[in-house]
Amino acid sequence: MAFKDNAVELEERVVAINRVTKVVKGGRNMRFAALVVVGDRNGRVGFGTGKSQEVPEAIRKAVEAAKKNLIEVPMVGTTIPHEVRSEFGGAKVLLKPAVEGAGVAAGGAVRAVVELAGVADVTSKSLGSNTPINIVRATVEGLKQLKRAEEVAALRGISVSDLA
């Protein structure tokens, strides 16, 4: 779900820069791959990757890709509405809501995604592979699965007060 209005300023964070080498007849060709997460700290976040022979160019390409890849994250106050588990490749991510003031208890790539999404209180655990791109993809997949109480009630055909 790409957002066309660039009126809001997006913050960007470089999660990983990888030097990739291709061995050819004439020697080694080196390139850089960048993984960047962007967000407005207000419920919108996205990630992108870029490759180039120069690091700044790879980062620029990744930021452009990330801006085209924004998703909306439903929030309840400063946390997420419910617990969610998601997988991508070998990476598994568990996200749990936390009480207000608890802060973001998350490592590296997960922290970048949830902070830029604007989630201030969350607990997370990364299991399996710790490859940054797969962790970021699993985290974003988990955030996509989140539903507000109103949405769940509507799907079940009951009122929000009957959900408990």
Swiss-Prot record:
Gene Ontology terms: biological process: translation
Entry's Gene Ontology cellular component terms: small ribosomal subunit
Origin superkingdom: Bacteria
Residues covered by the S5 DRBM domain: 10-73
PROSITE patterns, alphabetized: RIBOSOMAL_S5, S5_DSRBD
InterPro entries found in the cross-reference section: Ribosomal_Su5_D2-typ_SF, Ribosomal_uS5, Ribosomal_uS5_bac-type, Ribosomal_uS5_C, Ribosomal_uS5_N, Ribosomal_uS5_N_CS, Ribsml_uS5_D2-typ_fold_subgr
A Pfam family that the UniProt record links to this protein: Ribosomal_S5
Keyword Thylakoid in annotation: no
Keywords: Ribonucleoprotein, Ribosomal protein, RNA-binding, rRNA-binding
Molecular-function GO term, any one: structural constituent of ribosome
Entry note about domains: The N-terminal domain interacts with the head of the 30S subunit; the C-terminal domain interacts with the body and contacts protein S4. The interaction surface between S4 and S5 is involved in control of translational fidelity.
Similarity section: Belongs to the universal ribosomal protein uS5 family.
Quaternary structure annotation from Swiss-Prot or TrEMBL: Part of the 30S ribosomal subunit. Contacts proteins S4 and S8.
Described function: With S4 and S12 plays an important role in translational accuracy.
Name listed for the protein in its UniProt record: Small ribosomal subunit protein uS5
Organism: Streptococcus thermophilus (strain ATCC BAA-250 / LMG 18311)
